[in-house]
Amino acid sequence: MLGEVLRERNYIVTPLDIHAGQYDDSVTPVIYNGQKIPFADKSFDTGILLTILHHTNNQEEIISEAARVCRQLIIMEDIYSTQLQKYYTFFLDSFVNMFYSPCPHTNRPDKDWKNLFFKLNLNLEAVYYKKLLGVKQVVYVLKGEK
């Protein structure tokens, strides 16, 4: 849906996925091997990673590779600050994604995401917080190397 909204506003959208399945007839993602995104450095103005990182075991590599091909990153994830929030987030995510592949639930607290961005030498330009169904969500806006 986000891609459709962006295309209606004349943005060029290039979906990327590790699976060849189409989301609908208007979207055909570029398939990649989960390691090397098949585009040159800084090929895109903005990359959006929308609630996908907690479904992976190699977040650092994915973010690094996305930062390589994009001048700016927008990352949205579910975060937690207590054990109760952590397990509630895992439960809700498992329910919402029950028909998809198993999820390793590699969600992080806000502080851990920020530490990872610092480690990857990314500039944190803005942060937005919201709650949805009791789950804390965050959007990070990042620019390439400091």
List where the protein language model places each region.
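A short His-aromatic
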Residues: 51-55
